[in-house]
Amino acid sequence: MFVLDTKVVSTFRKATPHPAVTPWIAQTGWQAIATTVITIIELQRGVERARVQHPYVADNVERWLTGLLAAGTPQVLPMGVMAARLLGRMHETPALRHFILTDPQAKEQATGADLAIAAIAITAGAAVATGNAKHFLQINAWFPLPGLFDPMAQAWHVTVV
């Protein structure tokens, strides 16, 4: 199974999705693809941030997100107890603190989302599918991922165990 991160799920919304993602999903099949509640949180955060300056965009993205969730594909994995405990361990790993602590003046604040997505994927025994392998490779150094795949580059960074 693959767990899609926010960057990959966001490509579904584009008028012209990344040319490698659509065929990869068709080949893999929705039954082997999921995302997480963390990605839903990140997508909703994006809607709320856009609502102030770009309400039309926010409304469009919210409609898209509502439709995606109603369709049931990809399935959405919850944050279970084992993933929550693993995430707690990740938060207390000094080498990973930059995922949750950032400079208050930074344009984008760290949310810990990649840690949470990784924790859910690890406890589900699923490979992470991301367009941002760098972050997940940092996590993998401390908490081995079952797999790490970039569907945009069609490249495995951590092969399935």
Where are these regions (language model features)?
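Short, well-structured N-terminal submotif of metal-dependent ribonuclease cores
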Residues: 1-42, 47-65, 157
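Alpha-helix capping/helix-boundary segments
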Residues: 8, 39, 83, 117, ...
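Residues that scaffold the ATP/ADP-binding catalytic core of kinase and kinase-like folds
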Residues: 11-12, 46, 87-90, 139
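Short active-site oxyanion
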Residues: 31-33, 73-75, 122-127
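Short, hinge-like loop/turn segments at secondary-structure boundaries
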Residues: 51-54, 94-95, 145-149
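Acidic catalytic patch
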Residues: 70-106
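Acidic donor-binding loop at a coil-to-helix junction in glycosyltransferase catalytic cores
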Residues: 112-113
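Acidic, PIN/NYN-like endoribonuclease modules and their adjacent C-terminal/linker elements
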Residues: 118-161
